[in-house]
């Protein structure tokens, strides 16, 4: 049985992921899923490790005030993904959270395929990110 871990970091990513995963589930009912997701993924019957509110912080000040909680959740998420041992890590949007997790997972378990949906805007912000991302993301899916 194939296993997919779905990693989102905010409600909009949860919604985008649910659209893709809904199609995947209907065409491949034998896939086992686990996620860091929200209401949309839960509505598909997909178990989530914890509520998205535990990692969704908007604004520089809120992130700064919660930086230790965020780091703890990144570590916890990496550990749980490794424990689940998925064939694919499907991360969606929220690059400051999801790409940090994906990078660490890929370093620990290079055989896990990584797919990121909603490419970060590297051409506007942090142009050096492309060189780094290609080391741990196998495929990037774009929104059109």
For the regions a language model picked out, list residue spans one by one:
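Active-site and donor-binding regions of nucleotide-sugar-utilizing enzymes
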Residues: 3-144
């Amino acid at each position: 049985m194939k296993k997919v871990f779905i990693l989102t970091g905010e409600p909009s990513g949860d919604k985008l992921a649910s659209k893709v995963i809904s199609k995947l589930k209907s065409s491949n009912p034998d896939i086992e899923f686990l996620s860091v997701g929200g209401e949309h993924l839960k509505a598909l019957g997909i178990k989530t490790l914890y509520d998205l509110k535990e990692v969704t912080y908007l604004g520089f000040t809120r992130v700064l005030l919660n930086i230790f909680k965020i780091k703890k959740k990144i570590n916890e998420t990496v550990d749980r993904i490794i424990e689940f041992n998925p064939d694919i890590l499907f991360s969606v949007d929220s690059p400051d959270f999801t790409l940090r997790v994906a990078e660490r997972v890929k370093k620990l378990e290079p055989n896990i395929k990584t797919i990121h949906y909603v490419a970060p805007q590297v051409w506007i912000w942090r142009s050096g990110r492309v060189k780094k991302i290609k080391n741990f993301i196998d495929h990037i899916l774009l929104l059109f």
